[in-house]
Amino acid sequence: MKKILLSLVVFYQRFISPLTPPTCRFYPTCSQYTREAIEYHGALKGLYLGVRRILKCHPLHKGGFDPVPLKKDKNSKTTHHH
């Protein structure tokens, strides 16, 4: 599932995104964010985070820097995302 989702995002980045004007209001872009979220958090949570991000990407949202959230360990402390 993870590989399929990542393949779809990469396909979009390579073949569809270059045909459209840049409109993403965030850094990293929504497609890159989704790709990183899937790689880091796995298919389900990564897809959820990606869809949630895409829904925020509209003219009424200011956008800006919005990295993939870090995982939390069992003690609720964040771990580092590299």
From Swiss-Prot:
Domain of life according to the entry: Bacteria
HAMAP family reported in the protein's UniProt record: UPF0161_YidD
GO cellular component: plasma membrane
Name used for this protein in its record: Putative membrane protein insertion efficiency factor
Source taxonomy: Bacteria, Bacillati, Bacillota, Bacilli, Bacillales
Function recorded in the entry: Could be involved in insertion of integral membrane proteins into the membrane.
Chain positions covered by the region annotation Disordered: 63-82
Claim: Membrane is one of the keywords in the record: yes
Topology of the protein relative to the lipid bilayer: Peripheral membrane protein
Signal sequence bounds: none
Species per Swiss-Prot/TrEMBL record: Staphylococcus epidermidis (strain ATCC 35984 / DSM 28319 / BCRC 17069 / CCUG 31568 / BM 3577 / RP62A)
Annotated compartments: Cell membrane
InterPro entries linked: Membr_insert_effic_factor_YidD
Keywords tagged on the record: Cell membrane, Membrane
Family: Belongs to the UPF0161 family.
